[in-house]
A protein has these predicted regions:
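An active-site-proximal "capping" alpha-helix that borders the catalytic cofactor pocket
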Residues: 13, 50-65
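Conserved acidic
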Residues: 5, 47, 73
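His-Asp-centered metal-binding catalytic motifs of divalent-metal-dependent phosphohydrolases/nucleases
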Residues: 28-46, 51, 55, 78-85, ...
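Juxtamembrane helix-loop transition sites at the ends of transmembrane segments
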Residues: 46, 59-60, 123
Length: 137
């Protein structure tokens, strides 16, 4: 999968996450960084179970060089990145917002987002997000 395809995915995740994050009062800096970093260490779009762990390590390396997160923010970002592919749900507004943004773009791999894995604030975005994923922008 080329960088162009990944850039479109990251942009859609960022778009969805920011909309939901504002409604949920999530930490938007963490949400935005998640959008760019969560799949940055993927080796392919198929099975790559360690890509989240690698991306969380990258986030730690980039902190203080390219962005300034407080320790709790960095922990939240790294947890969200590490566990974003597992199908978990979180009561933490920022973590769930990150996961919502990524899950709303599952249409790019032929999967319709399931409301049971999304916050209630994400539910109204499913149809639009699916259309965006299928169109590729």
């Amino acid at each position: 999968m080329g960088w162009y395809t990944w850039a479109n995915h990251w942009a859609r995740v960022l778009y969805h996450s920011r909309q939901i994050g504002e409604a949920r009062q999530a930490d938007l800096l963490v949400v935005e960084l998640f959008g760019f970093l969560h799949d940055s260490c993927r080796e392919n779009d198929g099975k790559d179970p360690k890509h989240g762990v690698r991306a969380a390590e990258l986030a730690k390396e980039l902190n203080t060089q390219f962005f300034e997160l407080k320790p709790k923010q960095l922990d939240t970002l790294c947890f969200a990145i590490t566990h974003h592919s597992g199908g978990d749900v979180s009561l933490d507004a920022t973590i769930q917002t990150c996961w919502d943004g990524d899950r709303l773009d599952l249409g790019r791999v032929g999967i319709t987002p399931s409301p049971q894995y999304l916050s209630k604030e994400a539910h109204p975005h499913i149809e639009t997000a699916l259309a965006m994923s299928i169109r590729g922008h």
